[in-house]
Every structure is written in structure tokens, then in C-alpha cells.
Curated annotation (Swiss-Prot):
Lineage: Eukaryota, Metazoa, Chordata, Craniata, Vertebrata
Cysteines paired by S-S bonds: none
Annotated function: Present in the thicker 16-17 nm junctions of mammalian lens fiber cells, where it may contribute to cell junctional organization. Acts as a receptor for calmodulin. May play an important role in both lens development and cataractogenesis.
Gene name for this UniProt entry: Lim2
Protein name in the entry: Lens fiber membrane intrinsic protein
Illness association: Defects in Lim2 are the cause of the cataractous mouse mutant with total opacity of lens 3 (To3). Mice heterozygous or homozygous for the To3 mutation have total opacity of the lens with a dense cataract. In addition, the To3/To3 homozygotes exhibit microphthalmia, abnormally small eyes.
GO annotation terms (biological process): camera-type eye development; lens development in camera-type eye
Assembly with partners or alone: Seems to be associated with itself or another lens membrane component via disulfide bonds.
């Protein structure tokens, strides 16, 4: 059980760090504009060596930002529950901490999937036509890696929960 929780906690830490870095950085998309390279993130866009805040309130950017922030918050909550799962005292007999941590990591995975799906759909259908020479960049890719890490953290914690439940049910009362 502890090895699953340890693996889950490792994946969760890495996934949460990647979520925060992906959300905060400005390299979701790179493109060529007027002969020079430009890149943009969720909060700023940069032309040459100058960066500017994205002041327009565009729905897909707002949705992507919100889902990325919710994902990071769920992952952080899952880490807290995951660390508390190592403690053996049962404060809540009906609430399993590994199960709760796993649910939080799956919620984090869902939120980051929604954010990346929205960003991908709009970028490919709208911005891809506007900028001929463009590509997704490393911040965007970190988001996908974070999705995998939070998903595997959820899997590990669910395995720890199942192992704990099987042992609990097998012991005579």
C-alpha cells in the first residue's frame, strides 16, 4: 500500500509542478509574425523581445486559464490528502484518504484535459489559419505531461485504496 502511495505522491508532485509551470509560462504557441518570431501563453504574448499582457477577455483563454488553475488546486489538495494518507489514525471512518486523494487527482486530470482540449480546438481551428507558420510549444507540452502525471497519481492512489480495502476485509473482526 505504501509503495503505491509513494509512487502516487511522486507523480503528484511532478504533475503539480508541471501544471504550475505550464500555466505561468508564455510558450504555449510559437509563430512567425512580420518576419520575426513570436510566442504566447495564457497570460502574455511576446513579439521579439517585448512581452505584453493579454488584456482582451477572450472566452477560450479565460476557460483555459480557469481549468488550469482548478487543475492545480485539485492536484494540491490531492497532495495534502495523499500526505495525510500516510498517517494511520482514522479521523473519519467512512472517508478513505487514499481514495479521496485519488479522486482529487482524477479531478485534476479532468480539468487539465478540458483546458488543453479547449486550447487545442481553438488554436487549430482559428489561430492555425491566421498564422501560417506556427506550432505548439513547450508550455503546452508540459500541460500534457502534467495530465499524464496526475492521471497516474490517481491510479496509484486507487490501487493503494483497493489494497487497503482488501486487507481490511480479509482480517477477521
Amino acid at each position: 500500500m505504501y509503495s503505491f502511495m509513494g509512487g502516487g505522491l511522486f507523480c503528484a508532485w511532478v504533475g503539480t509542478i508541471l501544471l504550475v509551470v505550464a500555466t505561468a509560462t508564455d510558450h504555449w504557441m510559437q509563430y512567425r509574425l512580420s518576419g520575426s518570431f513570436a510566442h504566447q501563453g495564457l497570460w502574455r504574448y511576446c513579439l521579439g523581445n517585448k512581452c505584453f499582457l493579454q488584456t482582451e477577455s477572450i472566452a477560450y483563454w479565460n476557460a483555459t486559464r480557469a481549468f488550469m488553475i482548478l487543475s492545480a488546486l485539485c492536484a494540491t489538495s490531492g497532495i495534502i490528502m495523499g500526505v495525510l494518507a500516510f498517517a494511520q489514525q482514522s479521523t473519519f471512518t467512512r472517508l478513505s484518504r487514499p481514495f479521496s486523494a485519488g479522486i482529487m487527482f482524477f479531478a485534476s486530470t479532468l480539468f487539465v484535459l478540458l483546458a488543453l482540449a479547449i486550447y487545442t480546438g481553438v488554436t487549430v481551428s482559428f489561430l492555425g489559419r491566421r498564422f501560417g507558420d506556427w506550432r505548439f510549444s513547450w508550455s503546452y507540452i508540459l500541460g500534457w505531461v502534467a495530465l499524464l502525471m496526475t492521471f497516474f497519481a490517481g491510479i496509484f492512489y486507487m490501487c493503494a485504496y483497493r489494497m487497503h480495502e482488501c486487507r481490511r476485509l480479509a482480517t477477521p473482526r
